[in-house]
Regions:
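Alpha/beta enzyme core
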Residues: 1-172
């Protein structure tokens, strides 16, 4: 709860909140104005119905949006249930072996176009945003210009709508 209280005191607008913190009864007491996003991985919620159940529970506990690493069909299903969903594109740690390890993604024109395709798929599925992780700055800038959803940069430069930073980096 200390990080949540510190983020509130520092006027942080948006926070990625671990499920154990989100489900703590004091979370919304110490961080009433922060837009809180929480998530489960595709291994923790293996079906669309499991995601739906978990998301509804998280919204009841105070989440404002949910990360979803499930399929685009899962994102669409959640969106159709009026659940604000954020996707994840680029270096997705749980899938790093699929993209060649822990390194930048989107360095070739073909790979950059694939990232744009994924972002557009999230957009078409009804996501409110996407986290773009470890993507070349120029690619992130162009993707941000070509989508109507919010784009959070995590190691993808300042050209996105918001920066994803860790609490140690901004709170000390």
């Amino acid at each position: 709860m200390d990080e949540a209280a510190a983020a509130e005191a520092a006027c942080i607008d948006i926070a990625s909140v671990p499920a154990d913190v989100l489900f703590h009864p004091e979370h919304r007491t110490v961080a009433p104005t922060i837009f809180s996003m929480a998530g489960q991985t595709h291994t923790e919620c293996s079906s669309p119905n499991e995601y739906l159940k978990w998301c509804n529970s998280a919204l009841e506990k105070g989440a404002d949006a949910l990360y979803c690493s499930g399929s685009f069909k899962t994102v669409e299903m959640l969106s159709n249930e009026y659940i604000p969903v954020v996707g994840h594109v680029g270096l997705v740690p749980a899938r790093a072996t699929w993209t060649g390890g822990f390194k930048a993604v989107g360095k070739t024109a073909t790979d950059a176009m694939e990232l744009l395709k994924q972002v557009k798929s999230y957009e078409q599925a009804g996501a409110i945003g996407v986290e773009l992780e470890v993507v070349p700055v120029e690619v992130a800038n162009e993707i941000s210009k070509r989508t109507s959803i919010l784009v959070w940069s995590m190691g993808a430069g300042a050209g996105c709508d918001a920066q994803y930073l860790f609490s140690n980096d901004i709170l000390g």
